[in-house]
Amino acid sequence: MTMEETVYFTELYDSYHGLLTDRQDSMLALYYEEDYSLTEIAEHYDISRQAVRDNIRRGQKAMEDYESRLHINAKRKKRRNLLLDLLNETNQETIEALLEIDGDVL
């Protein structure tokens, strides 16, 4: 997995871990937050490495499905970028764009 993919899934995990099954949540926490290898997770749960990999992949797919429907991560990134724009230069367009993300209207 590339560094970009790891960052992407870590961000998705931060947004959607509460929607995962308990098993997926705990395995993904070990994988992304604690930096456990598949082998270490397999030993922790006393299951095969392949079973861990399958659970992690299902969790990744579930998080991508949630993001495609809810767009929480995309909105967070957009909001962050717009707030950085505000720090550099306060303008009406940036404020309106920030409000539009959440469906608010001036």
Report the location of each language-model feature.
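Short amphipathic alpha helix immediately N-terminal
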Residues: 22-34
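C-terminal flanking helix
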Residues: 60-67
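Residues within the DNA-recognition helix of helix-turn-helix
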Residues: 55-58
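Helix-turn-helix DNA-binding motif, specifically the short coil turn and the N-cap/start of the second
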Residues: 48-49
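Helix-turn-helix/homeodomain-like alpha-helical modules used for DNA recognition
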Residues: 81-106
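Helix-turn-helix DNA-binding elements, focusing on the entry/boundary residues of the two helices
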Residues: 37-39, 45
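Short amphipathic alpha-helical boundary/capping segments
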Residues: 11-20
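Hydrophobic positions on the alpha-helical face of helix-turn-helix-like DNA-binding modules
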Residues: 27, 41-42, 52
